[in-house]
Amino acid sequence: MRVVVQRVNKSSVKVDNEIVGSINKGFNVLVGIGKEDTIEDLKYMKDKVLNLRVFEDEEDKMNLSLKDVCGELLLISQFTLYGDCRKGRRPNFMNALGGDEAKKLFDEFVSMCREEGIKVETGVFGAHMVVDIENDGPVTLILDSKKNF
């Protein structure tokens, strides 16, 4: 499982020019599900994302987590995080999990985050989306549940 986490002041996602999800202070998270991902990958990523200490404390030190600041999550499915561009000029997406299976795991990840008491909004799985992000920092992190980077 791969995610790109962006600390935001606000973020929203539109499908067919309609806002389908929006948050205030928190994380905009692009979520890619790989062929080898399991529930254990989802649990690892949920714990990692919700507990990343990248919000400033009273001394302006990155010391607080999303949970600490009562932040919100906008989760957006993005299979292109598994794009392999090492050969040629067109990305190869062979390591991304296919549609129905990926949707099940994405939905499970959303549920797991909501169970933690976090406000969670989402895009629409498989849809063409327009994402509006007001970055804070900017702070952007790339995480991989297999710890490849």
UniProtKB/Swiss-Prot annotation:
* One GO biological process term: D-amino acid catabolic process
Q: What is its EC number?
A: 3.1.1.96
| Motif residue range(s): Gly-cisPro motif, important for rejection of L-amino acids | 137-138
- Please write the reaction equations for the catalytic activity of this protein: glycyl-tRNA(Ala) + H2O = tRNA(Ala) + glycine + H(+); a D-aminoacyl-tRNA + H2O = a tRNA + a D-alpha-amino acid + H(+)
UniProt GO cellular component terms = cytoplasm
* Top EC class, one word: hydrolase
**A Gene Ontology molecular function term of the record:** Gly-tRNA(Ala) deacylase activity
Q: Which Pfam families match?
A: Tyr_Deacylase
- Protein's UniProt keywords contain tRNA processing: no
The compartments listed are: Cytoplasm
Keywords from UniProt, A to Z, are: Cytoplasm, Hydrolase, RNA-binding, tRNA-binding
State whether it acts alone or in a complex, and with which partners, per the record: Homodimer.
Matching HAMAP family, A to Z? Answer: Deacylase_Dtd (MF_00518)
Function of the protein: An aminoacyl-tRNA editing enzyme that deacylates mischarged D-aminoacyl-tRNAs. Also deacylates mischarged glycyl-tRNA(Ala), protecting cells against glycine mischarging by AlaRS. Acts via tRNA-based rather than protein-based catalysis; rejects L-amino acids rather than detecting D-amino acids in the active site. By recycling D-aminoacyl-tRNA to D-amino acids and free tRNA molecules, this enzyme counteracts the toxicity associated with the formation of D-aminoacyl-tRNA entities in vivo and helps enforce protein L-homochirality.
Q: What is known of its domains?
A: A Gly-cisPro motif from one monomer fits into the active site of the other monomer to allow specific chiral rejection of L-amino acids.
Q: Give the family per the record.
A: Belongs to the DTD family.
Instruction: Report what the protein is called.
Output: D-aminoacyl-tRNA deacylase
Species of provenance: Clostridium perfringens (strain 13 / Type A)
